[in-house]
Amino acid sequence: MINESIPFKQINISVITISDTRNKDTDKSGAYLIKAIKEKKHSCEDYEIISDDPNNIIKTIKEKSLNKNIDVIITTGG
């Protein structure tokens, strides 16, 4: 149930697809997430596909968590 008395606040979301086989043309899960985010009137200006390497995943998430313009990080794949 949505509480209508609370004003809407747009959040900025980063989507990270973790895959060794996908690119921006073939990443269906990333595309779905971005579409759903925008349909709910939130922002997704940060989208990246990274390799399925644990060190790279940790590094990327740490970097994005330090970005003051990103409120939420969503990962898919892996």
Show which residues each predicted segment covers.
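Non-catalytic beta/alpha edge segments that cap or flank active sites
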Residues: 1-78
